[in-house]
A protein has these predicted regions:
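Short, charged beta-turn/beta-strand-edge "cap" motif at the junction between a beta-strand
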Residues: 12-16
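Short hydrophobic/aromatic-rich motifs at helix boundaries and adjacent loops
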Residues: 23-24, 68
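Compact nucleic-acid interaction/catalytic patches
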Residues: 17-20, 26-57
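C-terminal terminal-subdomain/extension
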Residues: 58-102
Length: 102
């Protein structure tokens, strides 16, 4: 799973009260962990450092979405349940730029 892959993962709530299965984009992979940004369809939450994703054949998403660069987590690989798709070259470039400017 390289950087830019979109996976389904059990993502914890920020208050740790539970989790939700949601898409996330991989930022880094180690032997046991994945570092990811979560993806949301709540377009009204748009922040300056978010990356907007439109539907395309590459990403496997069902709705227009946002990569929330402010929502980064390192999670055990076992929480990832499936590969949805991957970011396009332009989307990955936008993600890298937004991560470094945030």
């Amino acid at each position: 799973m390289p950087k830019g892959d979109i996976v389904l993962i059990k993502f914890p709530f920020t208050d740790l009260s539970g989790n939700k299965l949601r898409p996330a984009v991989i930022l880094a992979v180690t032997e046991m962990d994945l570092t990811v940004c979560f993806i949301t369809t709540q377009l009204q939450w748009l922040e300056a450092t978010d990356v907007q994703l439109m539907l395309n054949s590459l990403n496997g998403l069902k709705k227009p979405s946002l990569i929330r660069t402010s929502k980064i987590a390192t999670l055990d690989k076992s929480l990832a349940t499936g590969l949805l798709g991957k970011l396009s070259t332009n989307e990955l470039e936008d993600l890298n730029n937004n991560l470094s400017s945030g």
